[in-house]
């Protein structure tokens, strides 16, 4: 998660300056880029200013001794994007609105400027379908909280050029991010699908009364969580035997038996009620802000450890 010298991207345009866009802006600026931010909501600038001190402190803990680039705010998209080298789009998760927004961004930037969308689940092929220059549209999906989490998922659509993917990958890497370039599109991309599979089983376990939210979370935090954080699921499992083939041979039947009994989870009213009540019991008297502060402080320490000891 180290940084390298800034390449040809000097000015980054941020379109959509909500929570995701604000944290992208902080990360780009802290990596030395000039940031031009635009959002139709004038209150977004004040919201960022209120959060900026803590965002900068978080980034300083990960990357000390740097001088951040400037963040400039614009009330007009054309003015914001007039001379940018890269655009990070953070609009609503609606395919119709996303297409319109990408087409509008295109009107204000040169034909070779890569436009990366932060979309959580939409496919690039669908998003780029109405674009004039679809070859430069890519996915650049971050993980929350964006300014801290290293992962950025990159993938192109049917009309994306490989050079656009490489531009995005190089930019994110120079910021200290850990980009993964996917081989093809799929709904939910990579990490959310992995999380979704685990989350579905966790919800079912709570719904069916197998365990409480607190115990489900404890099982992960104090079980596979630390090992997976350092080495991922595959390498961690390989270490449980003399190699992956040996692991699959020895423990394959056990996992197959588990897979054969995994549950489906539908978020119907009874399930929502059960999960909500059990989560409230686990949270106790802590507020949302307290939980967020606990998370972000802990993430800094964890990410510093991964930088020193992580396998990948």
What is the role of each PLM region?
Residues 31, 154-185, 196-226:
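Internal alpha-helical scaffold of NAD(P)-dependent oxidoreductase catalytic cores
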Residues 15, 38, 74, 90, ...:
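Structural motif
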Residues 1-61:
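NAD(P)+-binding Rossmann beta1-loop-alpha1 motif at the extreme N-terminus of oxidoreductases
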């Amino acid at each position: 998660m180290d940084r390298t010298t800034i390449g040809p991207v000097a000015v980054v345009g941020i379109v959509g300056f909500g929570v995701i866009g604000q944290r992208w802006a902080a990360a780009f600026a802290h990596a030395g880029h000039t940031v031009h931010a635009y959002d139709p909501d004038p209150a977004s600038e004040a919201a960022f200013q209120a959060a900026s001190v803590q965002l900068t402190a978080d980034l300083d803990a990960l990357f000390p001794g740097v001088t951040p680039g400037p963040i400039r705010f614009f009330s007009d998209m054309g003015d914001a994007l007039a001379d940018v080298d890269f655009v990070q789009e953070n609009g609503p998760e609606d395919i119709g609105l996303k297409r319109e927004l990408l087409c509008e961004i295109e009107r204000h930037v040169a034909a070779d400027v890569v436009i990366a969308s932060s979309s959580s689940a939409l496919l690039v092929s669908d998003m780029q379908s109405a674009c004039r220059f679809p070859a430069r549209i890519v996915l650049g999906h971050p993980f929350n909280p964006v300014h801290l989490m290293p992962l950025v998922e990159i993938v192109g659509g049917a009309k994306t050029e490989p050079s656009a993917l490489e531009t995005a990958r190089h930019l994110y890497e120079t910021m200290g991010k850990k980009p993964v370039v996917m081989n093809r599109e799929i709904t939910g991309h990579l990490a959310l699908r992995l999380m979704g599979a685990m989350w579905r089983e966790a919800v079912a376990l709570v719904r069916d009364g197998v365990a409480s939210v607190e115990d489900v979370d404890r099982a992960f935090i104090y079980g596979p969580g630390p090992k997976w954080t350092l080495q991922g699921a595959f390498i961690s499992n390989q270490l449980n035997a003399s190699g992956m083939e040996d692991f699959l041979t020895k423990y394959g039947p056990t996992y197959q038996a588990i897979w054969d009994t995994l549950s489906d989870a539908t978020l119907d009213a009874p399930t929502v009620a059960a999960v909500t009540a059990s989560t409230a019991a686990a949270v106790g008297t802590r507020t949302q802000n307290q939980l967020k502060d606990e998370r972000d402080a802990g993430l800094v320490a964890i990410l510093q450890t991964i930088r020193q000891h992580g396998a990948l």
